Amino acid sequence: MPPKFDPNEVKVITLRATGGEVGASSALAPKIGPLGLSPKKVGEDIAKATGDWKGLRVTVKLTIQNRQAAVSVVPTASALVIRALKEPPRDRKKEKNIKHNKSVSFDEIVEIARTMRFKSFSKELKGTVLEVLGTAFSVGCQVDGKSPKAVQEAIHAGEIDVPEE
């Protein structure tokens, strides 16, 4: 027999979900079924929580305590960069490997870096900004009309100042 269920125990499950969509509850079932939760209801909660991330893949953190699931969205750097581009959501099933060609301002990149600070391994905000610029390069967008690589080189050369925190 499995051990008795402790109502005060907190379980944390992280999974990737597409924003605004109810994922296949069959994928959720093995993870949350043993905890006494309905996969269908949790799937709807995830869809509600990821509503403003329509069409983007985001990491979702499920905190389960006392048979209640709290859903929180942990956005990735690429999701934040794409969101900053303010492009309309595209159909993921039809278009694969989308290259984004709009431009993001450097101030928005710094704001994204501040948001991502808790996940970054860098010591200073400057390092996190460089990480986000690398993500912007892989997404295929520009920063203030220039290539993210050129902006990175300008930061290394000291031409662009990154604020301390």
From Swiss-Prot:
Domain of life per record: Eukaryota
Plastid keyword on record: no
Molecular function terms from GO: large ribosomal subunit rRNA binding; structural constituent of ribosome
Subcellular location: Cytoplasm
N5-methylarginine carried by residues: 67
One Pfam family of this chain: Ribosomal_L11_N
Functional summary from the UniProt entry: Component of the ribosome, a large ribonucleoprotein complex responsible for the synthesis of proteins in the cell. The small ribosomal subunit (SSU) binds messenger RNAs (mRNAs) and translates the encoded message by selecting cognate aminoacyl-transfer RNA (tRNA) molecules. The large subunit (LSU) contains the ribosomal catalytic site termed the peptidyl transferase center (PTC), which catalyzes the formation of peptide bonds, thereby polymerizing the amino acids delivered by tRNAs into a polypeptide chain.
GO cellular component terms, semicolon-separated: cytosolic large ribosomal subunit
Record protein name field: Large ribosomal subunit protein uL11
One of the GO BP terms on file: translation
